[in-house]
C-alpha cells in the first residue's frame, strides 16, 4: 500500500513537473500592446480610432462596463457553467459528441468560453493536433488568469465582422452607443454574432441575424433567465442596425495625443456633439475661404481650461489647404492679438490709464514705419479707443515706452512665448505680428481677461492639471475686458 502511494505521488509530481516545464517552454500568448487606440470624448464617445497592424478596431471594456443582460445572454448561450468548470466542460463535450455522431453531422459544439478565448489568442487547425493544442491553451488560461480576466479577453477579442473585435467596438460601430446601453434584443444578437460574424453580420444579412438572435432568446426563455415580457419585447424588436460607422472627429487632436506609450483608450475633455457641429460648420465655410487657406477653431472652458472643441484645420484630407497642418499647435503670426496684453501690462506699470491720450499719427522708428490696417490716422485717441479700434500706431508707441524685451519676457513668464529668428531680439514689430506664436498659448493668455489676470495652459485630457500663471493684475484684466466688450 505504501509502495503504491509512493508511486502515485511520484507520478503526480512528475506530471506536475512536466506541465510546469511545458508551460515555461510554450508560454501563453497573451495580447501585447498592438498600438490599437481609441480617442474618446469626455462622455466616452469615440472620436477617432487607430487600428492595429491588421486594421482591427477595438474599444477595451471590462465586464462591469457592459449591460448585465448581455453577460446573461452570452453565458447562457455559450457557457452556462463558465464559473464552475476548469476551462473544459466534459459533459458538454460528451453531449456535443453524441449529438454530432447521432446526426451524422456537426449539430453542436462543446467549446467553453475559455476554449474560445484560447482559439482567439492562438488560432489552430481543426485537426486532432489542433484540438489538443486548444485544450492545452485553455488549461493555461485557467492556471494564469481569473474567470473575470478570461471573460474580459472574450469581451475585447471576439470577432464581430470585418475589422471589428469586441462588443464595445461593435456597439459603437453598429448602434452608436456604449455596450452598457444595449437593449435585451441587441444583447441577444451580440451574444451569437461572434459565432459566424460574416454570415450573421446584421448590416448585410439582417434576416439571418434575426433568426440567430431569436434562437438565443428561446434558450433564455427555456432557462427562465429573462422574464416573458422581456423575451416578448425582444422578439418583437426588429434588427435595424445602421451601416458600420467609424469615429471620424478631431483627427489632428487624435494624432497629437497618440504616442508610443499612450493607453488603448485615450480620454479627452472634448464635447463630441459640439465638435461635430463645428466640423460641419467649418466644412460649410471651406468654399468661401481663399485658395490654399485653412482655418482653426479652439473652444475652451476658461474656468478649468478644458478644451471642448479642437479643429486644427478645415479638413485633414484637403492637401490643397495643407489640412495635415495643426494650426492650433503651429507657429503663426499673432497679428494684433497681443495688443490687449500690452495695454494691460502698461496699466499695471502705471504708464497709462484707460483714458490716457495716445497718438495715432504717422511716425518712423528707424527703418520701421508702421501703418494702420485701414488707411488714414485718427490723431490723439484715448487708450480705450485705440485698443477697441485695434489701432497700430498707438500700440507701437506704447510698446516703445514699455520695452519690447520686457513685454516678450513677461509674456514668456505667463506661458505665452513668442518665437523669433535665431539670435534675434524682440523689437517694435512684435506687437503687430512680427513674431510667431501658437493659437493654444494665445487662448491661454486671453483666459487672464476672464479669470482675474491668470493665464493658463489648455487641458486636453481630464487628468491634466490646471497650470495657472499671473499675466495681469485683476484690476487691469477687468479694465481690458470692459474695453474689449465695448
Would you name each region that the model predicts?
Residues 53-57, 133-138, 196-202, 259-263, ...:
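Flexible glycine/proline-enriched surface loops and loop-helix/loop-strand junctions
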Residues 74-75, 220, 278, 304-305, ...:
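Active-site SXXK
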Residues 268-288, 299-301, 310-313, 317-327, ...:
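A penicillin-recognizing enzyme superfamily signal
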Residues 1-291, 302-308, 313, 361:
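Juxtamembrane regions of bacterial inner-membrane/periplasmic proteins
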Residues 119-123, 156-163, 180, 184-196, ...:
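Glycine-rich, acidic and aromatic/proline-enriched surface loops and short helix-turn segments
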Residues 83-93, 165-168, 228-231, 321, ...:
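Short, well-structured active-site flanking segments
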Residues 135, 369-372, 403-446:
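Mid-domain, small-residue-enriched loop/turn segments at the edges of structured enzyme/sensor domains
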Residues 102-126, 180, 243-258, 352-407, ...:
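Conserved catalytic neighborhood of penicillin-recognizing serine enzymes
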Amino acid at each position: 500500500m505504501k509502495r503504491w502511494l509512493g508511486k502515485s505521488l511520484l507520478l503526480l509530481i512528475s506530471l506536475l513537473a512536466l506541465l510546469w516545464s511545458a508551460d515555461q517552454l510554450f508560454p501563453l500568448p497573451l495580447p501585447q500592446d498592438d498600438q490599437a487606440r481609441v480617442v474618446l470624448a469626455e462622455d466616452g464617445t469615440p472620436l477617432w480610432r487607430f487600428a492595429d497592424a491588421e486594421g482591427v478596431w477595438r474599444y477595451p471594456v471590462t465586464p462591469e462596463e457592459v449591460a448585465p443582460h448581455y453577460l446573461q445572454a452570452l453565458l447562457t448561450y455559450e457557457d452556462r457553467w463558465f464559473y464552475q468548470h476548469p476551462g473544459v466542460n466534459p459533459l458538454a463535450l460528451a453531449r456535443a459528441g453524441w449529438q454530432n455522431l447521432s446526426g451524422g453531422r456537426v449539430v453542436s459544439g462543446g467549446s467553453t468560453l475559455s476554449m474560445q478565448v484560447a482559439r482567439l489568442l492562438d488560432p489552430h487547425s481543426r485537426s486532432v493536433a489542433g484540438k489538443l493544442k486548444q485544450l492545452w491553451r485553455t488549461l493555461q488560461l485557467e492556471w494564469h488568469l481569473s474567470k473575470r480576466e478570461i471573460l474580459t479577453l472574450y469581451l475585447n477579442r471576439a470577432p464581430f465582422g470585418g475589422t471589428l473585435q469586441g462588443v464595445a467596438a461593435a456597439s459603437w460601430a453598429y448602434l452608436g452607443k456604449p455596450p452598457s446601453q444595449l437593449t435585451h434584443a441587441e444583447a441577444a444578437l451580440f451574444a451569437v454574432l461572434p459565432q459566424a460574424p460574416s454570415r450573421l453580420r446584421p448590416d448585410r444579412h439582417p434576416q439571418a441575424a434575426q433568426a440567430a438572435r431569436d434562437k438565443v432568446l428561446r434558450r433564455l426563455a427555456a432557462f427562465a433567465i429573462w422574464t416573458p415580457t422581456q423575451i416578448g419585447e425582444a422578439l418583437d424588436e426588429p434588427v435595424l442596425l445602421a451601416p458600420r460607422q467609424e469615429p471620424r472627429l478631431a483627427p489632428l487632436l487624435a494624432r497629437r495625443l497618440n504616442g508610443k506609450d499612450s493607453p488603448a483608450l485615450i480620454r479627452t475633455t472634448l464635447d463630441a456633439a459640439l465638435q461635430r457641429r463645428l466640423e460641419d460648420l467649418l466644412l460649410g465655410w471651406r468654399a468661401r475661404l481663399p485658395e490654399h487657406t485653412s482655418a482653426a477653431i479652439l473652444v475652451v472652458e476658461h474656468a478649468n481650461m478644458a478644451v471642448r472643441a479642437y479643429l486644427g484645420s478645415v479638413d485633414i484630407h484637403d492637401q490643397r489647404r495643407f489640412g495635415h497642418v495643426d494650426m492650433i499647435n503651429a507657429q503663426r503670426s499673432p497679428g494684433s492679438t497681443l495688443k490687449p496684453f500690452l495695454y494691460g501690462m502698461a496699466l499695471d506699470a502705471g504708464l497709462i490709464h484707460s483714458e490716457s491720450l495716445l497718438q495715432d499719427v504717422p511716425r518712423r522708428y528707424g527703418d520701421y514705419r508702421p501703418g494702420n490696417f485701414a488707411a488714414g490716422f485718427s490723431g490723439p485717441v484715448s487708450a480705450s479707443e485705440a485698443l477697441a479700434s485695434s489701432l497700430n500706431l498707438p500700440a507701437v508707441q506704447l510698446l516703445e515706452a514699455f520695452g519690447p524685451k520686457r513685454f516678450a519676457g513677461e509674456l514668456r513668464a505667463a506661458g505665452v512665448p513668442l518665437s523669433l529668428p535665431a539670435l534675434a531680439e524682440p523689437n517694435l514689430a512684435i506687437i503687430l505680428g512680427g513674431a510667431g506664436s501658437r493659437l493654444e498659448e494665445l487662448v491661454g493668455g486671453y483666459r487672464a481677461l476672464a479669470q482675474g489676470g491668470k493665464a493658463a495652459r489648455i487641458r486636453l485630457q481630464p487628468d491634466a492639471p490646471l497650470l495657472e500663471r499671473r499675466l495681469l493684475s485683476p484690476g487691469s484684466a477687468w479694465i481690458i475686458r470692459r474695453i474689449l466688450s465695448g
